[in-house]
Amino acid sequence: MSTSTAAPAPSLSDLCPAALRRPVAAALRALDPAPARLAVAVSGGADSAMLAVAAAAALPPGCTLRLFHVHHGLQAAADQWAAQVRGLGALLGVPVDEARVTVPPGQGLGMEAAARLARYQALAGLARQHGVRHILLAHHRNDQAETVLLRLLRGTGLQGMAAMAPLSERDGVAYLRPWLDVDRAAILALAGAVRAQCGWQAVQDPTNTDPRYARAAVRTQLAPALDARWPGWQAIVARHARQMAEAAEIVAEVARADFDTLEPADAGRSFSLAAWRGLSAARQAQALRHWLASQDAPMPTEARLAELQRQLRQLHALGHDRHLRWQHAGRVVRCERGRVWIDD
């Protein structure tokens, strides 16, 4: 008499479709040298949790994976979210590391921006603690489209319209966003499959649908109207962001090349005023932006930069004995003996 044995249930990694696994694998293959340690920033929501599943499925040989969770304490259910992340780590067989932060009020930042700053600082701390150089973030095509709309409405420039980059560095950590061309519907489908398989359910952040927050207002009020009139608009806007990123890179290359002709000295702290005046107005502005960024100075508004540009153009009428002193964010730009300097 023969007996039949039920097939073993698939692991969570087996549930991950190629459309979600392949972008992660491609992002990891592009890293040189290949990382020995990798982390996923996991809030407990569907997006970051499913990225953890995809990362476990795409993890190359010789690389270890960790989940980093930042506990903000901003929501009553924050402890439950942390528990959900620990549960996901147990299902994946992956260690979970938690950092608790307090989001300070004020600092001239809104709550969204302050929480984001605290989160990045906490992630950098966890990365240093565990020797991790690369962290995966779960931003997807819908997030990218929302970012472009928000920045457009806030009057951003070319660099801002490029929105989120697939790879960026901050505080010594490389952040990878492999899903910027992935629609969220595919992520939610995997979350549903995971829930059906093992009962693990993603947490719901109420701020994601609270229109008091700018991004949530775009998501709940503007996006539905665009969905109805222009289905698939997120892909179009995300493509626009990629094109803006290419354009911004070209502008940056021109600005670097122009600045190199300005006789820079003292580690780039000064340049020739006469050489700068030989540039067109648009290239003067880009050279100034490049210079300020290279000196770790906060980027001024368009109006403030135009004022600096105007003053530099008019210096010839003041004579060499009259020194420009343009103050910005604790830094001072001055002109002396035909050279423009920036001081702390």
Curated annotation (Swiss-Prot):
Keywords assigned by UniProt, alphabetized: ATP-binding, Cytoplasm, Ligase, Nucleotide-binding, tRNA processing
Pfam families noted in UniProt: ATP_bind_3 (PF01171), TilS (PF09179)
Any one biological process term the GO annotation gives: tRNA modification
CDD domains with a match to the protein in the record: TilS_N
EC numbers, comma separated: 6.3.4.19
One cellular-component annotation, GO: cytoplasm
GO molecular function: ATP binding; tRNA(Ile)-lysidine synthase activity
Catalytic activity: cytidine(34) in tRNA(Ile2) + L-lysine + ATP = lysidine(34) in tRNA(Ile2) + AMP + diphosphate + H(+)
Domain of life: Bacteria
Protein family membership: Belongs to the tRNA(Ile)-lysidine synthase family.
NCBIfam families: lysidine_TilS_N
Protein name: tRNA(Ile)-lysidine synthase
Gene this protein is translated from: tilS
